[in-house]
From Swiss-Prot:
This is Putative rRNA methyltransferase YlbH. The keyword S-adenosyl-L-methionine applies. May catalyze the S-adenosyl-L-methionine-dependent methylation of a specific base in rRNA. PROSITE patterns: N6_MTASE. The lineage of its organism: Bacteria, Bacillati, Bacillota, Bacilli, Bacillales.
């Protein structure tokens, strides 16, 4: 695993030890950022099922100024922190060990908005529609923002969730990727 582009291009990322996480492949990550970017002039991101932190770190490398990383797995949190330290990105990040729904509630209380939200839950525990509903209800997505929902290709996600509209859907092997933006 590596950073594909931007200020940290080519740098290696550690993967989470064991089989509890499924990192986004470099090919899928590159495709995702070609769909949403590829580069950014500032903005805040939320990597909600961070794993090794690959998606949020890629966003930072490509111009996001800050990213919040959330995962409930202790080994994943340690790996994110290690990758951020190695890449000298710790001052641009906050890392929390938390459940996804609790993390969304906490961010909503702080009235935190995001330019980019990355949702890549374990394929066996996908509650993407419920998470998209919370993001919409809490109005967490900025006007020009996007949500990347990575999922098992067999999962059918809704075209709309409240004011969120799926603008693109792609499949890469066993992985599906859906991009949502605000209606408007």
């Amino acid at each position: 695993m590596r950073v594909i582009s931007g200020s940290k291009k080519g740098r290696s990322l550690k993967a989470v030890a064991g089989t509890s996480t499924r990192p986004t492949t470099d090919k899928v990550k590159e495709s995702i950022f070609n769909m949403i970017g590829p580069y950014f002039d500032g903005g805040r991101g939320l990597d909600l099922f961070a794993g090794s932190g690959g998606l949020g770190i890629e966003a930072l490398s490509r111009g996001f100024e800050h990213c919040i990383f959330v995962d409930r797995d202790f080994k994943a949190i340690q790996t994110v922190k290690s990758n951020l330290k190695t890449l000298e990105l710790t001052k641009h990040a906050q890392v929390y060990r938390n459940d996804a729904e609790r993390a969304l509630h906490a961010a909503a209380k702080r009235e935190t908005g995001f330019r980019g939200i990355f949702l890549d839950p374990p394929y066996k525990e996908q509650k993407l529609k419920a998470l998209l509903t919370l993001i919409d209800e809490y109005q967490m997505l900025e006007e020009d923002g996007f949500i990347v929902a990575e999922h098992d290709r067999e999962v059918e996600l809704p075209e709309t969730v409240g004011d969120l509209v799926m603008t693109r859907k792609e499949t890469y092997g066993l992985t599906g990727v859906a991009i949502y933006k605000k209606r408007g």
